[in-house]
Amino acid sequence: RDGVFRIGDFFESITGYRTAPAQTSPHEWLMLDEATLAAATNGEVFADPTGQFSKTRQGFKDMPDDVRLALISKRLGMIAQAGQYNLPRSLKRGDGAAAWLSIHEFVNAASSLVFLINVPMVAGYLPYYKWQFAALRKLSKSMFALLPDVAEQLESVMRLSSAACYGGAGFGEGGKGSAPAIDQINGIVEHIAAEIVKELQREHLTTSTETFLEWQRPYIEDHIASNDPVLKSL
């Protein structure tokens, strides 16, 4: 659409909300996916004489920290489920399609986690998938980025995925098959998990050294101040 929007109409057309949900309404924040929040908060503002547009947009960047921690917990769970558990098992039984889908879920969860760790108010949100890696690369190159190496490692996983998932027994130089690619992917996944744990420890969000990330979730959720059940895992 071209033409003039009222400020509230503009944000409502993207998010369904004229202004950001209240800080005390975590269930409303959790209904907004990150790509939607990215669309509402990205882009250059050319003129805002009253400051109202910027104020409204900033409200959508100000995700309550309890919500951010709840999402971090969810992402840790998916990284563990897809990348550390289902992926190696799918590869071991030769189910290339299941392995490929596990990689997809792992990459998305890890990408989201990087943005959440870097805090939406500072880093913004993980955007729509076609801009995902462009945004990750840009964030990773910023001077004070947290987990700056994850983007490159995720791209390595994606480059290796075809050989690992569908290479077969006689694939590759010397007929070594898919085993070398599988070993590399599993190694990268565990390396990313270890980096995440180090960052969680640095931020005093965990005292555990456990690198299977599902077991880090209770430590993260201990820092959620609200008792709202939508913020806690079952």
Where are these regions (language model features)?
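Amphipathic alpha-helical interaction surfaces
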Residues: 109-120, 160, 198, 202
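Amphipathic alpha-helix face/heptad-repeat signature
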Residues: 72-76, 102-103, 185-188, 192
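Short acidic alpha-helical/loop segments enriched in Asp/Glu that coordinate divalent cations
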Residues: 98-102, 115-136
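Terminal (often C-terminal) interaction modules
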Residues: 140-234
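Short, hydrophobic, well-ordered secondary-structure elements
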Residues: 76-84, 88, 92-118
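Residue-level recognition of alpha-helical structural elements
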Residues: 68, 95-99, 125, 178-181, ...
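Conserved NTP/Mg2+-binding pocket subregion across the NTase superfamily
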Residues: 1-94
